[in-house]
């Protein structure tokens, strides 16, 4: 099913766009392939979101594009529709490549592409670490129109010559702020070096700090910019609160007191380290609370199974590191708890954007010790938002 985009928020979003960007009010106005239109409508979209109505036509024209919009505004479908429009399915070669910072996000993009391209006979493969290399090789040798992957595995497949790059027309960097941070920067350059010189580059993210925009000058030519103004970056419709916790040790008791509230729908609890995730999961289970947990060092099969259980509602409380924060779409999540405030303020919007997806009610609760007050104030200033102390009736806000 498509993201049910929050139209009220969408209508109020302010965009700073390059002068020649027009707005396409309907998908028909974008002159898309008939079978792609069928897939878009079957997926549940009726009309384009604000970012879709601005970015899709520009990307389809072949322009390098920087698109920034909040979580839950249809960013994934923006570049998925664009890729499906420009590829030639008669040519069984990789023509579009998407790089994402996490395996889960890369897999989710693959499923969106397959759903939107349902009537096009499109081949799309998720090329991610932690999976069988032999399966990657088999799929890539068969021929994939679109590859969605994580930078390390994609670079490896290109070096092995199993992922052939000579037909690639478009490179998409999703959650570009995270991708271009130190951890992935070199791998991105590794991949980019192998691409044809005329490859179009599309950069998509909820946050685009200046250093990222600066970096894009190295591999983009005269890009179209579709940027949400900073002041519009508060996730409208989400209620944000803090709970003052005198010391770190007391966070656990506070969380136990909140457990009944957490399970009204589904909740995600964020910690900053995998060690903290494991510790908190064990402590919660010892206290007879049902929780599941996930972090980047778990085997991929285990991560997939945990994600599936959570998506299906079999588990209701998930404890995770930031591996889960970026772009993962689970419709029923109404509550996010920052057990630890994020080290990087850019990640705050990615974390709390997991709750109240697409116009549903959502609540974010931040546990704040005296050492955290400065970080909380910094987040408030950065996003021009106000985070109030949590009221007693928080359960009522979720129902």
Curated annotation (Swiss-Prot):
Catalytic activity: ATP + H2O = ADP + phosphate + H(+)
Residues annotated to bind ATP: 69-76
InterPro entries, A to Z: DEAD/DEAH_box_helicase_dom, Helicase_ATP-bd, Helicase_C-like, P-loop_NTPase, RNA-helicase_DEAD-box_CS, RNA_helicase_DEAD_Q_motif
Short motif (DEAD box): ranges: 174-177
EC number(s) recorded for this UniProt protein: 3.6.4.13
Helicase ATP-binding domain segment(s): 56-226
A Pfam family reported for this protein in Swiss-Prot or TrEMBL: DEAD
GO BP annotations, alphabetical order: rRNA processing
Family listed: Belongs to the DEAD box helicase family. DDX48/FAL1 subfamily.
Name of the molecule in the record: ATP-dependent RNA helicase fal1
Species in which this protein is naturally found: Botryotinia fuckeliana (strain B05.10)
